[in-house]
Amino acid sequence: MNDLTIYDTLAESWWQAGSKLHMLARMNPARFAYFDTIVGHWQGLRVLDLGCGGGLTTACLVQRGVTVVGVDLSRASLHVASRHGRGHGHPKSVFACGRAESLPFADASFDIVWCTDVLEHLSDLPAAIAQIARVLKPGGLFLYDTINRTWLSRPLVIWFWEYLAGLAPRGTHDWRLFIRPQELRRLLTQHDMQCGAIRGMLPVWLSPRQGWCFRLVRYTGILYLGYAVKQVEESSSYAVSSRAETQTR
């Protein structure tokens, strides 16, 4: 269904342990285990948290010493994210309502665009990728995760995760919007983005007390993470580009 009103209806539950929206926070350890190796040094960077929701990832980014701008369509979720940031002394985070397809920022505004649990909800993915490339500085990094459109992802993500395991609210996903890696790679390449290696991520049941966690795996047929570097002229010495290019060698 891809019902995005869910994020307004359930906004107050973003930071409630055990809620279906807070389950997304359990992905962050695996995400950062991957992305920390790509970025290397976060301190002082300007990051766009695209589709920030209630700020679950924004908080982790601020802890790494970056300045974060969080953008989301859900005003109710943005209110929760802003309130949590103020309550936890995060002066380096600001929030704005906006769409991925028409970002309200100048060209080359960010060192990093972080976009997790978002791409598979977009109705106009090409427009969003064009905007992401536009607001990135030359040599900047696009960090993402999304869901692969495979025969296995439909029953696992929609039937099992939403209806049986309760890992996501019912109606959150539409299998037709899931994205194959080669499709995303083609769009990124069209906008002068150099793609890096991707990794898979899957939920793992620990115990009735601990519940679910997420781990990095080789298999990319369900969830996958990746990154791309906005290409820069050879004469440039932009720091983020240098770190990212080292990772691709």
Q: Where would I find each of the regions flagged by the language model?
A:
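N-terminal, positively charged/glycine-rich alpha-helical extensions of SAM-dependent methyltransferases
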Residues: 1-16
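Conserved alpha-helix/loop element of class I SAM-dependent methyltransferases that forms part
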Residues: 25-45
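Class I SAM-dependent methyltransferase SAM/SAH-binding core
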Residues: 56-102
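A C-terminal cap/extension of S-adenosyl-L-methionine-dependent methyltransferases
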Residues: 88, 182, 186-249
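A conserved beta-strand element that flanks and buttresses the S-adenosyl-L-methionine
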Residues: 114
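A short glycine-rich, Lys/Arg-flanked "PGG" loop and its adjoining helix->strand segment in the class I
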Residues: 126-138
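Conserved class I S-adenosyl-L-methionine
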Residues: 143-165
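Acceptor-substrate binding/catalytic loop of class I
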Residues: 146, 166-183
